[in-house]
């Protein structure tokens, strides 16, 4: 590689690093054109290479739905069962980049039985594209996906009214769907940002290039909006949240605390508070794998060295010196249930919260949510793909935020005790403890550990629920 090529490659890398990243998902009813939309975005931004096009043409002849034309939906419908049925089952992730921004796309299933897949895709996204068939208008799945998107903290919605070519590009149809959705959106979060774009994913109209067939629409194309939208972080994203994931002690002269800076900023010389012990200290060094930093930003993997020798454990939190965050042992959460095994009050699970694994007890199922009507339904159980609100009790005090304030420190996954399979995803609504640090209770800790022993090695005894009521009463 000559010097000019090296310089050009370095400039290209520098340019890529300076681009902002937007993560978004597509969702909607079955066959509204989600996969076709992504295929069109990739095709018209020249992200599909010649060899991919060759295989795409071949696959289109076997599994395509567009006759002799290339079926762009096959770009993301990767599973054989998806291609044969013409539907999306799994969450398909794709990456592409333009001159202005980098993107990660999650193409999520439209079928109700794949709600858990859709929730998985939405959990890491900043924006949601809701596909609506112009011929059919809003559907129950549109309502469901809108709610799940907002439940998982997404504040930006693009209502993509697709297949306008099949309704002769009539403005009246577009306006009616827009009106219906705005009425429905009043049931969702109050701080949503909603935009409506008429388009045809199949023909590429208003996706990357502006169409002349809808002169009544004076807005931007889909890509133009995605390239320019500025995602505003929540208020708590300015609050320092650094959970310790690893105690880094390679030799007797170095003791650091490694993890990912989930929110806020940190700099050398900063005075911080360590929770749950409520001890203050000062940052003396910030180290990465190849250099030292004066300051660290959100998302960076760092090792922090403190001025003082303090007993710090995995799962402890570094927060701002004036933070009012305190440990809590009881919370109300929204949960998406992801397994065939029914969730019942009295059960216990492991949860992973901010990198820390801890036992929780399901104290009460408050209600199940009908995601098609958004009505609260009284229920004593949650089944696969159900969404509900439950009250939980942690075996020990833990640190967390409300999910609406900080998605990174307000989410958890539920893990089955026996199989170690992920069975649910939880979003913390609020803490039920308002008294600050909770003192240790050795008797409770012993009973909790004793229960762990029984549930793991003697499940056939059939007594865990009775014991748990005693442990967490």
UniProtKB/Swiss-Prot annotation:
Matching Pfam families: GTP-eEF1A_C (PF22594), GTP_EFTU (PF00009)
Designated name of the protein: Sulfate adenylyltransferase subunit 1
Pathway linked to the protein? Sulfur metabolism; hydrogen sulfide biosynthesis; sulfite from sulfate: step 1/3
- Record-listed GTP binding positions: 28-35, 107-111, 162-165
Q: Which species is listed as the source?
A: Buchnera aphidicola subsp. Acyrthosiphon pisum (strain APS)
Q: Which UniProt keywords apply?
A: ATP-binding, GTP-binding, Nucleotide-binding, Nucleotidyltransferase, Transferase
For whether the record's keyword set contains ATP-binding, the answer is yes
Q: Which residues form the tr-type G domain?
A: 19-238
């Amino acid at each position: 590689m000559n010097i000019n090529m090296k310089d050009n490659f370095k400039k290209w890398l520098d340019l890529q690093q300076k681009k902002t990243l937007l993560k978004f998902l597509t969702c909607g009813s079955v066959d509204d054109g989600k996969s076709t939309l992504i295929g069109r975005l990739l095709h018209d931004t020249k992200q599909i290479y010649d060899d991919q096009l060759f295989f795409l043409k071949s696959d289109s002849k076997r599994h395509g739905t567009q006759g002799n034309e290339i079926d762009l939906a096959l770009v993301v419908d990767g599973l054989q069962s998806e291609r044969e049925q013409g539907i999306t089952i799994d969450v398909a992730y794709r990456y592409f980049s333009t001159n202005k921004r980098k993107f990660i796309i999650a193409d999520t299933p439209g079928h109700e039985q794949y709600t858990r897949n859709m929730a998985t895709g939405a959990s890491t996204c900043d924006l949601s594209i809701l596909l609506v068939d112009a011929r059919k208008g809003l559907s129950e799945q549109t309502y469901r996906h809108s709610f799940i998107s907002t439940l998982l903290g997404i504040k930006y919605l693009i209502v993509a009214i697709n297949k306008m070519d099949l309704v002769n590009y009539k403005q009246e149809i577009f306006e009616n769907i827009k009106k219906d959705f705005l009425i429905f959106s009043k049931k969702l979060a109050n701080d949503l940002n909603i935009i409506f774009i008429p388009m045809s994913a199949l023909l590429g109209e208003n996706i990357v290039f502006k169409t002349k067939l809808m002169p009544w629409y004076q807005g931007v194309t889909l890509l133009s909006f995605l390239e320019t939208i500025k995602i505003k972080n929540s208020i708590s994203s300015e609050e320092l949240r650094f959970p310790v994931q690893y105690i880094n002690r390679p030799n007797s002269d170095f003791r650091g605390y490694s993890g990912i800076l989930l929110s806020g900023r940190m700099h050398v010389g900063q005075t911080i508070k360590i929770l749950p012990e409520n001890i203050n200290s000062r940052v003396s060094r910030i180290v990465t794998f190849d250099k030292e930093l004066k300051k660290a930003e959100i998302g960076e993997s760092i090792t922090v060295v403190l001025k003082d020798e303090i007993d710090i454990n995995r799962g402890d939190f570094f927060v701002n010196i004036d933070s009012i965050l305190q440990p809590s042992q009881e919370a109300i959460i929204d949960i998406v249930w992801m397994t065939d095994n029914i969730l019942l009050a009295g059960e216990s699970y492991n949860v992973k919260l901010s990198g820390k694994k801890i036992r929780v007890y399901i104290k009460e199922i408050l209600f199940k949510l009908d995601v098609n009507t958004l009505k609260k339904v009284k229920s004593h159980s949650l089944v696969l793909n159900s969404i509900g609100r439950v009250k939980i009790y942690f075996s020990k005090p833990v640190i967390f935020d409300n999910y609406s304030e900080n998605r990174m420190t307000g989410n958890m996954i539920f893990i089955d005790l026996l199989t170690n399979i992920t069975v649910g995803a939880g979003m913390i609504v609020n803490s039920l403890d308002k008294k600050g640090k909770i003192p240790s209770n050795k008797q409770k800790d012993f009973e909790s550990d004793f229960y762990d022993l029984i549930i793991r090695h003697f499940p056939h005894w059939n007594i865990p629920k009775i014991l748990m009521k005693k442990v967490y009463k």
